[in-house]
Amino acid sequence: MTTALEEQNAQQAATAGRVVRVIGAVVDVEFPRGELPALYNALTVEVTLESVKKTVVLEVAQHLGDNLIRTIAMAPTDGLVRGAAVTDTARPISVPVGDVVKGHVFNALGDCLDDVSLNNNPEIERWGIHREPPSFDQLEGKTEILETGIKVIDLLTPYVKGGKIGLFGGAGVGKTVLIQEMITRIAREFSGTSVFAGVGERTREGTDLFLEMEEMGVLQDTALVFGQMDEPPGVRMRVALSGLTMAEYFRDVQNQDVLLFIDNIFRFTQAGSEVSTLLGRMPSAVGYQPTLADEMGVLQERITSTKGRSITSLQAVYVPADDYTDPAPATTFAHLDATTELDRSIASKGIYPAVNPLTSTSRILEPAIVGERHYEVSQRVIGILQKNKELQDIIAILGMDELSEEDKITVARARRIERFLGQNFFVAEKFTGLPGSYVPLTDTVDAFERICNGDFDHYPEQAFNGLGGLDDVEAAYKKLTGK
């Protein structure tokens, strides 16, 4: 009898608050004076809907005064009623960390979706998702290239190891495919650990990604965290932080180099805008939240290299209506070390990855970092492609015959370069029937230098379509000409 009474008293002490208002994903909770939970604390409330009990997690967003707090629900609030008892967990949302997360799928709250035995296991270490970025004296100042084996990236927009890379593009130009390819290449070539955060994207894509990674044998080195389109804005706003927290553990505790993939960072911004509106804040430009730059900075500043280890981040950035002046992609630009723009006009030519070499950038494409020869070849390639672009109006109006002999050669080389910048991907093998290819950086520089020098001017353009290195070009040439 005494034990039962003690349990009841303990439960009453823990259940300190009660729901006073529910408007969609916004839940106002009243707590006794002096017992208000801190901002970002996770609260729990039991909900019964159609005889099914579930626990809804609320995150504290505002202190309203008069012992009231405003929270954002991390699950649908169907069945939640006024007066429901609310428990303060006294800590923020936390996720499991360590090797146990590899090969599994989690939601933003750290619940494993494919193996429920991992849930509520006290032996598994958990970290809160709201963390401070590394201090200034912990940061790594060295700059190093991350070789991907993808020609167009390694030559013209080299990625920084421990940097932040943005994959920009509208709908359907190949952002997710390029991210899947990078996960595969990192697992195969570097045996590295990857964390994938699916932010507000299609549930079908998440399922396909999980099955494809399992099929290709790279799932055991990857942790996946999803907060998809059908989930409340609070989940979509926090899932990127959940994935980042898992990556930080591998970097800080296991001293690993980690790749963090975020698909799609625009949905993170979009979810923040929804939450801001729900909380009653005055919107800023184009309806986005006034705290857009701050929220982006909180996420991006934690993605960095510390001494001896790194988090390299690839972030897909959906560009609304292909408008790069939109505040969401424009705010993201400020944090990136390299930008890879995927262009619909290049995709329409059947060239994949559809990277626009003239608008994609990298801060390390300079002689002091990549070397004189790499830099010179990249500038020659860009120069030829730029000249070809300038000549397109003349060609469209007057035709190729009106060009000078020098310009005709430039256009011909540009067309070969455009096709050779395409490449067959490992993740696309089952669609194209062509095996994926990894081209070392030195081979890439050699190949494009020879194309710029005119060594392949007598080769037909078809010999350069979507191939790997020069060996593939030679084989295609022999097949086309019968020589």
Curated annotation (Swiss-Prot):
Asked if the keyword Protein transport belongs to this entry, the reply reads no
Q: Quote the record's binding site residues for ATP.
A: G169, G170, A171, G172, V173, G174, K175, T176
Is Cell membrane given among the entry's keywords?
yes
Note the Pfam families from the entry.
ATP-synt_ab, ATP-synt_ab_N, ATP-synt_VA_C
| One Gene Ontology term of the molecular function aspect | ATP hydrolysis activity
Q: Name one GO cellular component term.
A: proton-transporting ATP synthase complex
What is the E.C. number? 7.1.2.2
What this protein catalyses is:
ATP + H2O + 4 H(+)(in) = ADP + phosphate + 5 H(+)(out)
Family matches, as InterPro entries? AAA+_ATPase, ATP-synt_VA_C, ATP_synth_F1_bsu, ATPase_a/bsu_AS, ATPase_alpha/beta_chains, ATPase_F1/V1/A1_a/bsu_N, ATPase_F1/V1/A1_a/bsu_N_sf, ATPase_F1/V1/A1_a/bsu_nucl-bd
EC class: translocase
Where does it live in the cell?
Cell membrane
The way this protein sits in the membrane is described as: Peripheral membrane protein
Q: Where does the source fall among the domains of life?
A: Bacteria
**Which keywords accompany this UniProt record?**
ATP synthesis, ATP-binding, Cell membrane, CF(1), Hydrogen ion transport, Ion transport, Membrane, Nucleotide-binding, Translocase, Transport
Major place of residence: membrane
Q: Name the protein family.
A: Belongs to the ATPase alpha/beta chains family.
Q: What does this protein do?
A: Produces ATP from ADP in the presence of a proton gradient across the membrane. The catalytic sites are hosted primarily by the beta subunits.
Q: What quaternary structure, including any partners, is listed in this protein's UniProt entry?
A: F-type ATPases have 2 components, CF(1) - the catalytic core - and CF(0) - the membrane proton channel. CF(1) has five subunits: alpha(3), beta(3), gamma(1), delta(1), epsilon(1). CF(0) has three main subunits: a(1), b(2) and c(9-12). The alpha and beta chains form an alternating ring which encloses part of the gamma chain. CF(1) is attached to CF(0) by a central stalk formed by the gamma and epsilon chains, while a peripheral stalk is formed by the delta and b chains.
PANTHER family attached to this UniProt entry: ATP SYNTHASE, ATP SYNTHASE SUBUNIT BETA, MITOCHONDRIAL
Can you name this protein?
A: ATP synthase subunit beta
User: Origin organism of this chain?
Assistant: Corynebacterium glutamicum (strain R)
